[in-house]
Amino acid sequence: MMPLAGIAWNLMLLFSAVQGLPLQDGEGTQHPDLLNNPPKGSVEPVALEQLVHQAILKKDFLAQDVFFPGTTAIPTRAAPISLTEGVSDASGVLTTAVGGAFSLPPQLSTLIPPSPAPTGGPGPSPEAEEETTTTLITTTTVTTVHSPVLCNNNISESEGLLEAPEYGGSTFFGGLDCTYSVSVYLGYGVEIRVERLNLSKEEALSIEGLEEDRRFLLANETLMAEGQVIRSPTNHVAVRFQTYRATSPGAFRLRYQAFVLSCVFPPRPENGEVTVTDLHPGGAANFRCSAGFTLKGGESLVCLNISRPEWSGKPPVCAASCGGVIRNATVGRIVSPDISTSHSNNHGNNLSCHWLIEAAEGQRLHLHFERVSLDEDNDRLVVRSGSSPLSPVIYDSDIDDVPERGLLSDAQSLYIELISDNPAVPLLLSLRYEVFSESRCYEPFLAHGNFTTTDPLYSPGSLVSFFCNAGYMLEQGPPVIECVDPADPHWNESEPVCKALCGGEISEPAGVILSPDWPQNYGKGQDCVWGIHVQEDRRVLLEIEILNIRRSDALTVYDGDDLTARVLGQYMGVHQRFNLFSSANDVTLQFQSDSNDPVFSLSQGFIIHFKEVPRNDTCPALPEVPNGWKTSSHPDLIRGTVVTYQCEPGYDISGSDILTCQWDLSWSNAPPTCEKILNCADPGEIANGVRRASDPRFPIGSHVQYSCNEGYTLEGSRTLTCYNRDTGTPKWSDRIPKCVLKYEPCLNPGVPENGYQTLYKHHYQAGEALRFFCYEGFELIGEVTITCAPGHPSQWTSQPPLCKVAYEELLDDRKLEVTQTTDPSHQMEGGNIALAIFLPIILVILLIGGIYIYYTKFQGKSLFGFSFPASHSYSPITVESDFNNPLYEAGDTREYEVSI
C-alpha cells in the first residue's frame, strides 16, 4: 500500500484540480462511478493518475481565452458579433460557434509525458507491473480566417438617405462589406445625388444598376464627386461599400429618390413619319410611310412598363414597294425597290413591278425623272397614259431618251412598268409625280435647283424663273417660262435642267465644282478642264470634300491659269477630305477618265469647294486644342514652319502631333485633339508570382491582385487600384509588389559606437545589405557591408564592424601641420629682412649665455651673486621627441631647455 503521505498528496492534487469541474457523461472525463467501483483489473494509482491528468487538461482548457473571428486574445479587438455559443466542454475537438468566420482544419499533436519517478514505498503488485499505462496529451490548434463583417440592407422606399456605417468604437477586424439594395416601382428609376464623399485609398464605393440577372456599373469612387447626380435606367440599384480598415470607416452620404422612366423617342423611318402619344409606359408610337413605300414591321409600338422601359418591338422601315395602286394622288415619288429584299423576287435578280397612279376627276399628272440609271440590255422602263397595260405608251427606255422635262398624262392616270433581268449595273430610279388642275399649269420642278414665281397657283399669265444650285448650270431650256392659253393652260417652254458640266470658266469669289453628271456617275473617256479666277490680290483655297474616283482616272490641280503651270497635286482613287492653296489668283483643274478601261465600274465622283482668301506667305492660323497647347518653330507661319501639339497630363493626343507648313501654304495634317485618358498603364507582371486583373484594359476603377508562387511571400500591396486624377494621368494606388523567398528576416545588428548605418530599420529581408560608416577621426574595423544571408533563420554574413580612434591619421595630420609651419618655402618671403634683424640679437644672446655657463659651470660661482641649492640636468626636447606624445603640439623646430 502506498504511504499515507503519498495518498494525501494525490488527493489534494485531485480536489484542487477538479474543483468546479462538472463531471457528466460525454464530457470526456472519468465518471464518478469509476472512483467507487473501478473496473475489474484496474489499479487504483493508475486510475487516480488518469483522473488527475484529465482534470488538469480540462482546467487548462477552460482557462483559455475565447477567440472572436479575426482577433487575437485581446478582448478589445473583437469584432462586433455576438457569441451564440461558447467553447465546447468536450476534451476532443474545440469548436467556436461564431458567424462571419470560418476555421481551418485543426492540427493535432500528441505529447507523451515521461513516466513518473518511483516513490520510496512498496512497488506495485505483479499484475500492475505487467500493465503499462501511457498518457496522451492531445493539443488542438484552431486557425481562424478573418472575413469582412456584413452589413446589408434592402430598401423599398421611394426616397431616402444612404450613409456609411457609424463607428461606435468597435474594431471591424477584416473590414466591412456593406450592400444597400434600393428598389422602387416598375416604370421608375433611381436618382442618386452625392452629398458627401470622404474615402481613403483602402475603401471602395460603387453604384450598380440591376436588370434581371445583369449588373452594370453606373459610378464608383474614382468617378464620383460631391454634387454629382447619378441616374439608373432601371428600378433597382445596388450601392456597395467596402473598407479594409479595422477602425473608423470613411464617410459618404447619398440621397436617392425615384423618378419616372420613359422610352427613348423612336427614330423616324426614312421616307416615312412617326407620331408618339406618350414616351412613358403605356404610350404608343405610330408609323406610316410616304406614298410609294411600304411599311416593313408593326404600325404601332407600345412603351412597356418594365424595369427598363422599352418599346414593344423594333421600329419599322419604309421600303420602296415593287408596284401598287396610288389613288387620289397629289404629290409623291416612285423609287426602285431593292432587288435583294423585294417580295416579288422569286427568280434571282429578276424584277417586274407595276404601278398605277390615279388622280381625282378632272385632274392630270406630271411625271418628272429625277434620277434614272438603267442597264441598257437588261432593264426596261415603260410609261403609259392610262390605267391599263394596253394604254398608249408615252415613254419606252428601249426607244426614247430620258425626258429631262418630264411627261404629261392625257388622262387622270399613269401606268408605269419596270422590268429588270439580272442587271450588270445597280438599278436606280426616282420618279416624281404631281397632280394639277386642267384650269392651270402644273407646278414646275427643277432638280438640283429652285425657282421663283409670280403666282403660286400657276394660273395663266404667271411667270417662273429658274436657277441652279452651286456647281450646276442651266441647260436645255430658258431661265424663265410663262403659263399661257387659258383655254388649255400650259407652259410656253419646258423647264430647263441643272447639270454638272464637264469643265468651264469660273470667275466667282466662291463656288463648287462637281464631277460630270453629279450625283450620277461620270462616264468614261472624259477630259474636263475648269478654270478658277479670283481677284488679283487674292489666292484660291480648294476644299476637297469628296474624292471617289477610279484608280485609272486622275484629278490634277495646277497652280496657274493653264495646264503648263506647276502641279499642286495629282490624285487617283479614294482620298479623305483635304485642302489645297494656290500661290496666285488662278487655279486650273483637269479631270480625265480612262476610256480604254475594259472593266469600267461606277464611281461616285468628287465635290470641290473653292473660295478666294487673302494672299500671303503664311499658312492659316491653327486653332488651339482644348486640354493642350502648341509650340511653333517660327513666330510667323511661313513655309517650313513646324508646329508641335502637346496635351496636358491626363490627356492623350489623337492625330498627328507635328504639323508642317507646306510649299502651297497648307498644313501637312489636320490639327489633333486631346482626349481624356481613362486607363492606367499596364502595371506589369511579377517574378515568381501571378496577377489577376478585373479588366485587361485597366480602366479607372479596375483592380489588379497579385499573389506569389509557393515558397515565396508578397512584399508590398496585394491589390492595386486604378484611380483618376483631375490634373494627371490615371495612376495605380501603389507600386507593384514583388515576391521574395520565404526566409525569416535578419534583425538589425545595432549601430557601432562612434558610427552609423545606412537605411536603418528593424528587420532586413534575405539578400538585403547593410552598410556601416564611422564618424570623422575613427576608423572602421571589420566589414563595411554585411548581407542578410537566407536561412532558417537568416543570418548576417559577418559581425558588425567597430569604430576605433584613428591614431596614425591624427599623427599624420599633426606632422603635416608642423611641416607646413616650418617649411622654408613658406618663409622665403621677407627672409632676408628677418635675418638682418634677428641675427645680431641671437649673437648677443649666445655671448651672454656663454659667459653665464663659464661662471656657473667652470668657476662654480653665480654671475649675479645668487647661489642655487643644486644643479639639475636638463635635456633638450626636440620636435622628434614631441611627436611621440600625441597630446603635445610644437610650433617650430627650435630647442628648449627646461629646468625642473
Curated annotation (Swiss-Prot):
SUPFAM superfamilies in the cross-refs: Complement control module/SCR domain, Spermadhesin, CUB domain
Ranges of Pro residues composition bias in the record: 113-125
Region (Disordered) residue spans: 111-130
Keyword annotations: Cell membrane, Disulfide bond, Glycoprotein, Membrane, Repeat, Signal, Sushi, Transmembrane, Transmembrane helix
A Pfam family recorded for this sequence: CUB
Gene3D superfamilies noted in UniProt: Complement Module, domain 1, Spermadhesin, CUB domain
Similarity remark: Belongs to the SEZ6 family.
Protein name: Seizure protein 6 homolog
Organism this protein belongs to: Xenopus laevis (African clawed frog)
